[in-house]
């Protein structure tokens, strides 16, 4: 760094100082200017002047002052006619405390002694002179001299810096050493906060003593001797004692009892503990100067000084530092729960917060102290000939120092960040190259398992599976991301990590679980169920899309960097199942990616990620996700559910083109509510002036304006469950099993022996050809079995259904009612079967229509059900009904008559084979899948016990 660069960086901070120094020269008399120049050019010492006729050997009231000066290293100067008299004439300081000489600033021992005696009884003098509270070795006189020395020493040190800048040949190293020497003393003394007048005076005394001993900036202290140049900020910080250690413990704002949050508001005082005491201390100090100089210390003057100091103190400047210390404490507490899992990154983050807080606190305290002193001295200088140039000098010095500090600030932050980076890289080297931030995700997941182990262990019972595979996506972690940004390692972090944990019999498997979740290739393999017959694949959180991430750290401004994400995405997930009866729930797998435009905002463009499911053997239940799904059910009885949480939108199932059983095309709408979308987000971390922006993948719930349309392909799927919307099912030429779920659905079996369950809603069920089983469910349904020997199921609460039938030997079974609980009434061209409790009815309006008539589906029908069966197997026939009602316009078959007819049938021989087939259909339907539970529940349904005596054949 050359001098020109250094001067440019200091220009803004030094400008005020140079202007103030120039004003000081013009404001004083000619003698003052000459004396000031001589002081700058000379040794610039502080002297204690002793009257020429004072005899030290004989002793007197001044001996105490002389002894104190000797202890403090303040030179004694015996008055003579030459230098003292000329000084008095030139700057008009007759009978004043302070005066300039050719070799420095003189303090009149005589005048000081008089002032001490004059004000010895005042509270102010007692405060300034309470040496016992500071150091038992210092007398009151010693302490006051130390205070004066400290203030003037600070000013003289600033003049040294100014003279270096003006020389034009000073090196950057000299400037850095000068500024850092001042920083060192201010940080170690002032930044710990001022709690009393005595402490403030003591700190200034030490500061002045250290700087006043500096001669020509050649010997700047042992701590900075090895500083090679200004650019080596790391070493510079380490050389500054206490900057990065110790201060946070002593700094008042770090104390949780400082009440910063309660006492701070924009434009108001920080708190009495901090700024109040600083104000009191500096006010008392400058008032003492005025008293010592013989100036007024009235209440009005004191108020002016206090007001000036308060205006120089910014409460909000302290808040940033206070927040960092507070955050560090919170992060430290947060870090404890992850340390036992081998991750210390949160502690590193807290370490940075403390370091940054220390820097902010130190520099804020320095600038606050300098600004307050400058303001106080300026206020105290009112009415003082000597005070005015001194005040201007102090203002100039503080402006210059502030500029130097600001130029050094970024290097301080980077030193802390670089130290943390070194720790991270050292850890990776010690741990075989493992990624430090990935280790952070591992610790987060281990903590998640520990905290939620009880709930996770209950999944076996909840999902009714001997084995549960829980897949958890640890998403982007702000703390881990912030640490990566601070340490300039943002290109080494990932957006998260997916984990698979196996639970068997309520216990987590600690060893190998025979599960593979490869987020790079998009393969999830759970085909080895570890000998268990039932298992469930459960996603505890939304799973990000598969692929490979890379990042590149690019500079996009002087202090600005962006870690750009590049993602090679796999277009689908593949899930492999094995022999177990598995429950595969994909409702939390993210299947839509939302893209951003060049400005980082969502563009509205999306990409769909497919799910390929190879279910293997076993009876599997597959819950559809939020996007395209290709399912191969394999062997076994497999079911696909579109009913999870009510479903995502309307489902249209089409099996009309199937060439093999279980093959369907499902066109569905995804427009109900909000869906998971993978998005690119950004996190920005501030390190002083440097900003680090990290791009990462995350997910959000979004509701697209028009929704999505997608198409699923199902193969070897035996059963499909619809949504809460109005779904359409069209069966194949094979046996189909459809459940409408909620909504007003349309189910058509077409060919094959189909099972159609309407579920809730006003549904239309049409069996078509084949021996079908039709269950309308709740709602007012329209049901037509079509050709074949069909079975209709009715339950309590099903609503008022309309039933059509054509051809075949058909049966209507009341699963929960005896015939004695029913009544049959004649209608215009048909009959109405009513439940006596009013819970539902079945209207067969075309029972008596001829075959020339057509039903609503356009097919001819005789609309008669050959047998009506009660829950205990009692039955009546269509012929028995016709005998009682055919030739009547109105009429009723009572419950008693129905019971009598059923009793007569018990002694008759019936077709046991036909009845057994009907019985099997009903039992299988009720035992393997309860239509109520199937459409409403998200989980496997427990097998119902076979209904006793339902359709049981009578003894023959």
UniProtKB/Swiss-Prot annotation:
Source organism of the structure: Kingella kingae
Coiled-coil zones: none
Chain intervals for the UniProt region annotation (Cholesterol recognition/amino acid consensus (CARC) region 2): 340-348
Gene: rtxA
GO annotation (BP), single: killing of cells of another organism
GO cellular-component term (any): host cell membrane
Outcome of substituting residue 448 to F: Does not affect cytolytic ability
Pfam name, any one: RTX_C
Hemolysin-type calcium-binding repeats: 613-639, 722-756, 757-791
Modification after translation, per record: Myristoylated by RtxC; the toxin only becomes active when modified. Mainly myristoylated; a very minor fraction is acylated with hydroxymyristoyl, lauroyl and palmitoleyl chains fatty acyl groups. Fatty acylation is involved in binding to host membranes and promotes the irreversible insertion of RtxA into the host cell membrane.
Lipidation (N6-myristoyl lysine): 558, 689
Membrane topology (UniProt): Multi-pass membrane protein
Key word Repressor present: no
InterPro entries: Hemolysin-typ_Ca-bd_CS, Hemolysn_Ca-bd, RTX_C, RTX_pore_form, RTX_toxin/Mannuronan_C5-epim, RTX_toxin_determinant-A, Serralysin-like_metalloprot_C
GO molecular function per UniProt: calcium ion binding; cholesterol binding; monoatomic cation channel activity; pore-forming activity; toxin activity
Known role: Bacterial cytolysin that attacks host cell membranes and causes cell rupture by forming a pore. Binds and permeabilizes target cells by forming cation-selective pores. Constitutes the key virulence cytotoxin of K.kingae. Binds cholesterol and oligosaccharides on the surface of host cells. Does not bind beta-2 integrin (ITGB2) on the host cell surface.
Location(s) in or outside the cell: Secreted; Host cell membrane
Family to which this protein belongs: Belongs to the RTX prokaryotic toxin (TC 1.C.11) family.
Sequence segments annotated as region (Cholesterol recognition/amino acid consensus (CRAC) region 2): 349-354
Keyword vocabulary terms for this entry: Cytolysis, Host cell membrane, Host membrane, Lipoprotein, Membrane, Myristate, Repeat, Secreted, Toxin, Virulence
Name of the protein in question: Cytolysin RtxA
Region (Cholesterol recognition/amino acid consensus (CARC) region 1): 280-287
Region (Cholesterol recognition/amino acid consensus (CARC) region 3): 444-453
Description of the deletion phenotype: Cells lacking RtxA display strongly reduced virulence.
Cholesterol recognition/amino acid consensus (CRAC) region 1: annotated span: 48-58
């Amino acid at each position: 760094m050359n001098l020109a660069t250094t001067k440019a960086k200091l220009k803004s901070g030094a400008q005020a100082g140079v202007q103030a120094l120039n004003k000081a020269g013009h404001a004083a008399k000619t003698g003052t200017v000459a004396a000031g120049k001589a002081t700058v050019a000379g040794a610039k010492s502080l002297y204690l002047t002793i009257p020429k006729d004072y005899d030290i050997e004989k002793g007197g009231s001044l001996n105490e002052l002389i002894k104190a000066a000797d202890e403090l290293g303040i030179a004694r100067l015996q008055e003579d006619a030459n230098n003292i008299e000329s000084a008095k004439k030139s700057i008009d300081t007759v009978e004043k405390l302070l005066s300039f000489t050719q070799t420095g600033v003189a303090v009149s021992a005589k005048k000081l002694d008089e002032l001490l005696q004059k004000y010895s009884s005042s509270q102010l003098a007692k405060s300034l002179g309470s040496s016992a509270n500071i150091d038992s070795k210092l007398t009151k006189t010693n302490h006051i001299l130390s205070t004066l020395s400290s203030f003037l020493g600070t000013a003289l040190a600033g003049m040294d810096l100014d003279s270096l800048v003006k020389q034009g040949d000073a090196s950057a190293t000299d400037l850095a050493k000068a500024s850092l020497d001042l920083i060192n003393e201010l940080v170690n003394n002032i930044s710990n906060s001022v709690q009393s007048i005595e402490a403030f005076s003591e700190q200034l005394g030490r500061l002045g003593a250290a700087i006043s001993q500096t001669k020509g900036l050649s010997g700047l202290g042992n701590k900075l001797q090895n500083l090679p140049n200004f650019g080596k900020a790391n070493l510079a910080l380490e050389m500054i004692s206490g900057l990065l250690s110790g201060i946070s413990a002593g700094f008042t704002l770090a104390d949780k009892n400082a009440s910063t949050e309660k006492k701070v508001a924009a434009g108001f005082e920080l708190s009495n503990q901090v700024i109040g005491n600083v104000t009191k201390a500096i006010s008392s100090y400058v008032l003492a100067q005025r008293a010592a100089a013989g100036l007024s210390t009235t209440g009005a003057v004191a108020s002016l000084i206090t007001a000036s100091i308060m205006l120089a103190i910014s409460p909000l400047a302290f808040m940033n530092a206070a927040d960092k210390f507070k955050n560090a404490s919170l992060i430290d507490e947060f870090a404890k729960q992850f340390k036992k899992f081998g991750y210390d990154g949160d502690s590193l983050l807290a370490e940075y917060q403390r370091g940054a807080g220390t820097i902010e606190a130190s520099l804020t305290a320095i600038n606050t102290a300098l600004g307050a002193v400058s303001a106080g001295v300026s206020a105290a200088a009112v009415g003082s000939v000597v005070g005015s140039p001194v005040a201007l000098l102090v203002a100039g010095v503080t402006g210059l120092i502030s500029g130097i500090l600001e130029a050094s600030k970024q290097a301080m932050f980077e030193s802390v960040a670089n130290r943390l980076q070194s720790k991270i890289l050292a850890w990776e080297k010690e741990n075989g190259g493992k990624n430090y931030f990935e280790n952070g995700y591992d610790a987060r997941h281990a903590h998640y398992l520990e905290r939620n182990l009880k709930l996770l262990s209950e999944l076996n019972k909840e999902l009714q599976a001997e084995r549960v595979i829980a897949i958890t996506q640890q998403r982007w972690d702000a703390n881990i991301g912030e640490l990566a940004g601070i340490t300039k390692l943002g290109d080494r972090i990932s957006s998260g990590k997916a984990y698979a944990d196996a639970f068997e019999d309520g216990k987590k498997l600690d060893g190998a679980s025979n599960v593979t979740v490869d987020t790079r290739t998009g393969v999830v393999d759970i085909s080895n169920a570890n000998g268990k017959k039932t298992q469930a694949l459960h996603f505890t959180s939304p799973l990000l899309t598969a692929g490979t991430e890379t990042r590149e750290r690019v500079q996009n401004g002087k202090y600005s960097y962006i870690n750009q994400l590049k993602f090679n995405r796999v277009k689908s997930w593949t899930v492999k199942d094995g022999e177990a009866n598995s429950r595969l729930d994909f409702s939390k797998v993210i299947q839509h990616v939302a893209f951003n435009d060049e400005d980082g905002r969502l563009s509205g463009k999306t990409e769909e990620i497919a799910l390929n499911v190879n279910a293997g053997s076993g009876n599997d239940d597959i819950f559809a996700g939020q996007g395209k799904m290709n399912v191969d059910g394999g062997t076994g009885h497999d079911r696909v559910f579109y009913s999870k949480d009510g479903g995502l939108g309307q489902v249209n199932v089409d099996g009309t083109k199937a060439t093999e059983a279980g093959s369907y095309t499902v066109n569905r709408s995804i427009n109900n509510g909000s869906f998971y979308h993978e998005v690119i987000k950004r996190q920005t971390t501030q390190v002083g002036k440097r900003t680090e922006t990290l791009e990462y993948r995350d997910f959000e719930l979004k509701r697209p304006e028009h929704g999505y349309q997608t198409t699923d392909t199902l193969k070897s799927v035996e059963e499909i469950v619809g949504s809460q919307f109005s779904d359409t099912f069209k069966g194949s030429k094979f046996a189909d099993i459809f459940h409408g779920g909620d909504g007003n659905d349309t189910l058509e079996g077409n060919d094959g022996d189909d099972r159609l369950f309407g579920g809730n809603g006003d549904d239309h069920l049409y069996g078509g050809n084949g021996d079908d089983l039709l269950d309308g469910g709740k709602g007012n349904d329209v049901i037509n079995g079509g050709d074949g020997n069909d079975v209709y199921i009715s339950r309590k609460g099903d609503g008022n259904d309309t039933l059509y039938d054509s051809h075949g030997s058909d049966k209507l079974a009341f699963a929960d009612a005896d015939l004695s609980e029913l009544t049959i009434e004649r209608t215009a061209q048909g009959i109405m079967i009513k439940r006596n409790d009013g819970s539902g009815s079945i209207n067969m309006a075309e029972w008596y229509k001829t075959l020339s008539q057509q039903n609503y589906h356009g097919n001819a029908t005789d609309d008669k059900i050959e047998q009506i069966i009660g829950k205990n197997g009692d039955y009546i026939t269509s012929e028995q009904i016709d005998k009682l009602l055919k030739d009547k316009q109105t009429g009723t078959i009572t419950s008693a008559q129905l019971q009598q007819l059923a009793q007569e049938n018990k002694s008759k021989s019936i077709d046991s084979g036909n009845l057994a087939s009907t019985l099997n259909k009903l039992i299988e339907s009720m035992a393997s899948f309860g239509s109520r539970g199937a459409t409403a529940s998200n989980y496997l349904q427990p097998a119902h016990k076979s209904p006793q005596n339902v359709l049981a054949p009578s003894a023959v």
